[in-house]
Amino acid sequence: MVMIVAGHAIVHGLGFGNIQANTNNNQFGLTYFEMNSFLAIAVNCFFWISGYFQIKRRISRAIELIVETMGYILLLNIILYIMNYSGVVYYLDILRIIKRVLFFYQGYWFLTAYLILFIISPYLNKMVEVLSQDEKKELLITLFLINSFCGFVLKIASLDSGFSVVQGVYMYLVGSLCRTDDIQNFFKKKGKILNVLFVIFGLLNGCAAYIFGSKGYNEVAWRMFSYNSPVIVFMAIVACLSVVHCSRSSKICDKLGKLSRYSLAAYLLTDYPLIREVVFLPLKYMNSMSDFEKILLIFLYAIMLTFVCMGIDSIRKCLYNYIENKLNI
């Protein structure tokens, strides 16, 4: 989640996402392209981990996620409305807030994709379970060819963008298929080599994006960070397998895993279009700093912001449980 927040800080806070439309990208040096190359894997990692450990669908949890999201959006819009309050309550403003709350999926593609994935996960899990080892490897290769080659390279309609439910299902299945003994044993033997390739591919991908951007190929430069890019997918798989193998012998990962239940607020508060401009406003005053200082500050700010959001979400959960207990009485 820290990686996702740091990615939001660069893309939305510093305006790095605008490189696809700008003709002059000199304001962003090679460092930003390299940094975003490694941060772009975070969303894929989230879906992959969900598939590896396999989601256990509970309707109550799906409803809870929807209610939490709508509650946060309502609260954020009320706060923004009060901050801009002119002394007159406009009917259209109220309707606009209601629309944003009810149609929250228009601003949160990632959460929407996860909710849909949450609903269909039992069927995906059963499909993977009945496949043989060879069939699983065949399916893994087929999915890669369809989404990462046909989608990213050939730009086939509805597959060319990684910002979709298709990408979520793709990475979920990849995560499930990586549970096979063959892949686990392969990673144990070649883990160090794969980790080196992870770093090399990340650096080369960022460098290529920077070169394309400096030559005026802005859309191509931004496309290098697409979630269905073969490089981004490969890096996400290697990163996740490394974490999974480390977590088997590390209690720290278990403790960090318990904190993930409070991570919803970090995503909701840093990716909402109306609020992220305020959240990342302090980062706009880093012009006089060196690139190294900027990167360090971005990560520190992302860590701080993540834990602040987790604190807010933990308070919300306490209030939710308190109200629920009172109602049960």
Sequence positions of predicted segments:
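Solvent-exposed interhelical
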Residues: 59-60, 118-145, 177-197
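Aromatic-anchored segments of alpha-helical transmembrane domains
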Residues: 2-9, 72-79, 141-155, 198-212, ...
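Alpha-helical transmembrane segments and terminal signal-anchor/GPI-anchor hydrophobic tails
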Residues: 166, 185-265, 272-280, 284-298
